[in-house]
UniProtKB/Swiss-Prot annotation:
Spans traversing the lipid bilayer: 54-71
Domain of life: Eukaryota
GO CC aspect terms: Golgi membrane
Cited PANTHER family: PROTEIN KISH-A
Residues of this chain annotated as glycosylated in UniProt: 35
Pfam families xrefs: DUF1242
InterPro entries: KISH_domain, Ksh1
Signal peptide (residue range): 1-26
GO biological processes: constitutive secretory pathway
Organism: Mus musculus
Protein name: Protein kish-A
Amino acid sequence: MSAIFNFQSLLTVILLLICTCAYIRSLAPSILDRNKTGLLGIFWKCARIGERKSPYVAICCIVMAFSILFIQ
C-alpha cells in the first residue's frame, strides 16, 4: 500500500524527511540554505522544523519506532 493512503506510513515518511533534512543541514548547510523558496524550499522548511522542534521530533520518532516494531 502506498504511503499516501496509509496514515501511519505517511507520518513515517514525514518524520524521516524531517530528520534527514536536519541531518544534511547540520553537515552541509549551504546545500539547503540556497533554496529557501519554491519546490526545493520544502527541504529547507523540514530542516528548520527538525532543528527548532527537535525534542518533539525525537519523541515522535521514538513513538513511531515503538509502534512499528511492537504493534504492527
